[in-house]
Amino acid sequence: MKGTGGVVVGTQNPVRDYNHSTDEEYQRLRRLADEAYKKRDQLSHESQTAYQQGDKKLAHELSEKSKAQLKTAEDFNMQAAEYVFVENNADSSSNEIDLHGLYVKEALFILQKRIKFAIDHNEPQLNVIVGKGLHSQNGIAKLKPSIEEFCAKHGIRNHLEKGNSGVLVLELQGVQMQMDGPAVNAPTNQYNAQPHPQYNNNGGQPQGQAQNYNNSGNDNKDSTLTSIFKIFCNCIQSLA
């Protein structure tokens, strides 16, 4: 049986043929997010111009519209993250997690929760599918080095799966992660930047200085990514 993304599920040896880089729905959601960021930037620029010209009322109106576009962009990115995560993990075994198609902050946020789950359930290893960076800008992988850095920070030994440089094997025996405060914050409105991030081309590593409008959406984003993780937990528990 195939999932909507072309993943064969329900077999003993599932075939991995889902590719987010050619998935029209995934690309549509990321593209809509990118377009909303561009609108946000334009409205922000117009707001600043109006303010400098002394029209504070117009500046405020444009600023509010800019904030609305920011929320729209973030919503589309969260939809894309949920969509690609579910598609990629439809055929994942209970000791692996596929982070293809997630931006770095999305991936790290979900990964830290998955590691905590593994530790709590005495799982000795976790296979993290990160890919080889073939779809990243200039073919430079972003997920793998970011996850290796995360592991180094938390004392998690890791190595590449033999014969597969797109899979990091995390050794979790004896690992104790302090999770009282999040090791990785949920993606917030600071995942974007001024100028707007070219998400479709750089794998979700925005460059530049973030413009911080407000933090009112942080809890919603935390909740959304937690929900994505819970979907994954349900999948692996069904395999147990």
Curated annotation (Swiss-Prot):
Q: Which SMART domains match?
A: DUF1771, SMR
Classification via Pfam families: DUF1771 (PF08590), Smr (PF01713)
- Single GO term (MF): endonuclease activity
Q: What is its main location?
A: cytoplasm
Domain Smr per the UniProt entry, residue ranges: 97-173
Which parts of this chain are annotated as the region Disordered?
A: 1-24, 181-219
Stored PROSITE patterns: SMR (PS50828)
Name the domain of life this protein comes from.
Answer: Eukaryota
Q: Which UniProt keywords apply?
A: Cytoplasm, Endonuclease, Hydrolase, Nuclease
Q: Where in the cell is it found?
A: Cytoplasm
Enzyme class label? hydrolase
Any one Gene Ontology cellular component term annotated for this protein: cytoplasm
Q: Which residue ranges have biased composition labelled Low complexity?
A: 194-215
Provide the E.C. number(s) assigned to this enzyme.
3.1.-.-
Q: Name one GO biological process term.
A: nuclear-transcribed mRNA catabolic process, non-stop decay
| Cross-referenced InterPro entries | DUF1771 (IPR013899), Smr_dom (IPR002625), Smr_dom_sf (IPR036063), Smr_domain_protein (IPR053020)
Keyword tRNA-binding annotated: no
What happens without the gene? Impairs nonstop mRNA decay.
Function comment: Endonuclease involved in nonstop mRNA decay via the formation of mRNA cleavage fragments in the vicinity of stalled ribosomes.
Give the free-text miscellaneous remark of the entry.
Present with 2130 molecules/cell in log phase SD medium.
This chain belongs to which protein, by name?
Endonuclease NBR9
Where does this protein come from, organism-wise? Saccharomyces cerevisiae (strain ATCC 204508 / S288c) (Baker's yeast)
User: What's the gene?
Assistant: NBR9
